[in-house]
Curated annotation (Swiss-Prot):
It holds the Pfam family RuvC. This is Crossover junction endodeoxyribonuclease RuvC. InterPro entries: RNaseH-like_sf, RNaseH_sf, X-over_junc_endoDNase_Mg_BS, X-over_junc_endoDNase_RuvC. Mg(2+) 2 binds at E73. It comes from Chromohalobacter salexigens (strain ATCC BAA-138 / DSM 3043 / CIP 106854 / NCIMB 13768 / 1H11).
């Protein structure tokens, strides 16, 4: 089920041991189209059960949306070693689930994702949410983990097209251009 040149449905995953965000986009046309997003909320305190819930949730998403490729965020260095280890375990669980479904997995660093979606690798979560909403033409702002997962899927879409930055999706007003340093979340 790998997508060699014909992949149109991409699943982005923002792994976590408590909340795993997901975002599904269709890239059949040059402009990515929103399909779905949300969060897998982990209800257990036991590690094995947490990982089983991540695996089951990702498996359910794969069955429902039939993605051709999966993109996931790479582990970033954390000051808290325990948190980084738990994140790595959740991430590994998602990768194994994808592999067991015959899907190719693509990995992107957090700074690559922010750069691709916002134009700067130092973007805040709010800036990522704002740009994901604008790029996909969403009516509302997705929850942070879901927005991150959509940003991961968009990053993969842009990488597949050989682009590093997204095209402008909003109407451009003459004489006005929004800059990130001017953006203030509501």
């Amino acid at each position: 089920m790998t997508g060699e040149g014909s992949a149109t449905i991409l699943l982005g995953i923002d792994p976590g041991s408590r909340i795993t965000g997901y975002g599904v986009v269709d890239v059949a046309t040059p402009t990515p189209r929103y399909v779905a997003s949300g969060c897998i909320r982990i209800k257990s305190d036991q590690l094995a059960q947490k990982l089983a819930q991540v695996y089951a949730g990702i498996g359910e998403l794969i069955g429902l949306h039939r993605p051709h490729e999966i993109a996931i965020e790479q582990v970033f260095m954390s000051k808290n070693a325990d948190s980084a280890l738990k994140l790595g375990q959740a991430r590994g669980t998602a990768i194994v689930c994808a592999a067991n479904h015959g899907l190719e997995v693509f990995e992107y660093a957090p700074t690559q994702i922010k750069q691709a979606v916002t134009g700067t690798g130092a973007a805040t979560k709010e800036q990522v949410q704002h740009m994901v909403t604008a790029i996909l033409g969403l009516d509302g702002v997705p929850q942070a983990d879901a927005a991150d997962a959509l940003a991961i899927a968009l990053t993969h879409a842009y990488a597949r097209q050989g682009r590093s930055l997204p095209p402008s999706r909003g109407r451009r007003r003459s004489g006005s251009r929004q800059r990130w340093r001017d953006y203030r979340p509501s």
